[in-house]
Amino acid sequence: MELNYNRVELRGVAEDAPLLSHVNHGCAFYRFTLSVLRLSGQADKLPVIVPRPLLLLTPVSPGDGVHITGQLRSFNNKSGQGSRLVISTFAQTLTHDADEPLNRIFLSGVLCKQPALRRTPLGREICDMILAVNRRYGRADYLPCIAWGAVAQQVSLLHTGARLTAEGRVQSRVYSKTENGVTTDRTAYEVSIMRPVDRTEFPE
């Protein structure tokens, strides 16, 4: 059984029309934002990268209900503008689907730095970590993850290089950053770990 695992499944509403993101090995890839409602009523605004052949089979317009399966990917942004680590969902399947919102991810990888346990101003425990999930051909995705409460305490006991296998959801979070006296709003994307699991629980 392959130890590394990365599978995300999303169902939500397209916020915008797909725009060309980049071309790789002659294949064009497009980017759009998928809005996925939480139970609280707040929505996660998640960037999706989709190959052109999938878009030709299933065109996407703003307001369309969309179901996606794929992988959560990271890209090291060396332009000096925006986030240094760019996180997006790479779509491997794409269909029209207006059913209930869905947001879940299954990951198995290794911790590439020591988990950091801290308390929020309201006294709730939270643990930050970076999970490295290997792809084929020697590449890896470095995925920011957070855990809360009892799960935060549990994963904080792990050390760099330890394997973490977990189920969670992908979330967006808006924060403010001040540079040279100018404050701007930015959006971070991360995995909220719901529970550690056994690898045998994952869909194949």
What are these regions (language model features)?
Residues 1-204:
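Single-stranded nucleic acid-binding surfaces, predominantly the OB-fold ssDNA-binding core
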